């Protein structure tokens, strides 16, 4: 993306904190997106990568203590390794990133706040629990507590901040396995729905195939929550585009978030299909890149974030997407998806 592209996509939006109308008259909350540095207005977000990672710790839960923990890694080292990758995004026009590492997998809001300040990027963190990978990253209490009790934990992070940092989540991150929803997966979805109703935070669900995706939509419907409050994460792992179209028509956000050199052509085709069905307004895009791997020397092989801008956006242009389409996908849709707003049926 060259300088002309940067200006065209509208990257000069000022950073503004969300607030309220003057006292003495009816107060209406401004639309808000919650970053690790505090609230901003949606028009301040700018072009966004909607699903990336700064670090992850896949060690078994028994080897780690309660979140956040720096016992297994040096935050200063992670900062030094990751910061150049974030700084490399700014010349390409990127201004924001949703960081998807959940609790009990290395979520570190304080580190993200440092990286945000140093890089100039808006970073979002999350609340919620990750039930994918056969539940191995769920703390034991998840299996015994009710959905309401889990929701209360997540709501507390919204009202009080995460683990004493004062940093509030910008979305709800849950994970489910790739088959029909298990009992604990279903509980996580209900807890997320109830958290959304009390906070307005959007639900991003690590999902993949269509079967658990549509089962989640049914749970949300039972809870009275609109599909527009839910992001189908890793939707590219469902190979029948008809399911993407069906979910988008129900109002869900469909996230094609595995953009990489090996998957570029597939992601272009998926986006083109959604354009052909006039559904680009329900699509989110990202790479699932980065990944300082705790336990590997120097964090292992960090995948740069810039491929999205250097290769993927030009490939979308070559496939017939217009500049208005790209603005929709990189600016308008992310701002709408991550705006804090209760969305009921």
Please provide the spans of the model-predicted regions:
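Twin-arginine (Tat) signal peptide motif
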Residues: 1-7
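Mid-to-C-terminal alpha-helical segments outside catalytic/metal-binding sites
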Residues: 7-22, 31-38, 306-345
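Alpha-helical scaffold segments that flank or form the walls of functional sites
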Residues: 46-50, 63-122, 148-167
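Divalent metal-coordination and catalytic microenvironments
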Residues: 51, 97, 196, 254, ...
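Histidine/acidic-residue-rich catalytic or RNA/ligand-binding cores of hydrolases
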Residues: 58-62, 109, 135, 213-219, ...
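Active-site gating/metal-coordination segments in enzymes
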Residues: 95, 114-117, 122-202, 253, ...
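Catalytic pocket-lining loop regions of alpha/beta-barrel enzymes
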Residues: 193, 197-276, 283
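Short acidic/histidine-rich active-site segments
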Residues: 204, 257-258, 279-302
């Amino acid at each position: 993306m060259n300088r002309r592209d940067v200006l065209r996509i509208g990257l000069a939006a000022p950073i503004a904190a969300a607030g309220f109308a003057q006292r003495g008259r009816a107060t209406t909350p401004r639309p808000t997106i919650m970053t690790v540095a505090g609230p901003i207005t949606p028009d301040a977000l700018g072009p966004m990568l909607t699903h990336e990672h700064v670090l992850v710790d896949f060690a078994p839960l028994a080897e780690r203590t309660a979140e956040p923990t720096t016992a297994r890694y040096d935050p200063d080292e992670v900062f030094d390794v990751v910061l150049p990758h974030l700084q490399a995004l700014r010349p390409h026009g990127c201004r924001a990133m949703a960081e998807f590492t959940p609790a009990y997998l290395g979520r570190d809001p304080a580190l993200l706040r440092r990286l945000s300040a140093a890089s100039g990027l808006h970073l979002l963190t999350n609340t919620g629990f990750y039930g994918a990978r056969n539940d191995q990253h769920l703390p034991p209490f998840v299996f015994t507590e009710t959905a309401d009790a889990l929701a209360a934990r997540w709501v507390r992070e919204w009202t009080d901040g995460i683990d004493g940092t004062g940093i509030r989540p910008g979305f709800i991150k849950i994970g489910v396995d790739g088959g029909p929803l298990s009992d604990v997966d279903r509980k996580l979805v209900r807890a997320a729905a109830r958290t959304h109703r009390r906070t307005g935070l959007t639900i991003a669900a690590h999902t993949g195939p269509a079967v658990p995706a549509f089962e989640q939509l049914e749970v949300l419907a039972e809870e009275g929550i609109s599909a527009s409050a839910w992001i189908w994460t890793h939707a590219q792992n469902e190979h029948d585009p008809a399911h993407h179209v069906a979910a988008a028509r129900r109002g869900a956000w469909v996230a094609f978030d595995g953009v990489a050199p090996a998957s570029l052509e597939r992601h272009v085709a998926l986006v083109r299909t959604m354009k052909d069905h006039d559904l680009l307004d329900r699509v989110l895009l990202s790479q699932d890149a980065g990944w300082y791997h705790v336990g590997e020397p120097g964090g292992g092989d960090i995948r740069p974030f810039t491929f999205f801008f250097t290769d993927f956006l030009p490939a979308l242009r070559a496939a017939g997407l217009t500049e208005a389409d790209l603005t929709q996908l990189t600016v308008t849709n992310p701002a709408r998806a991550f705006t804090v707003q209760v969305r009921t049926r």
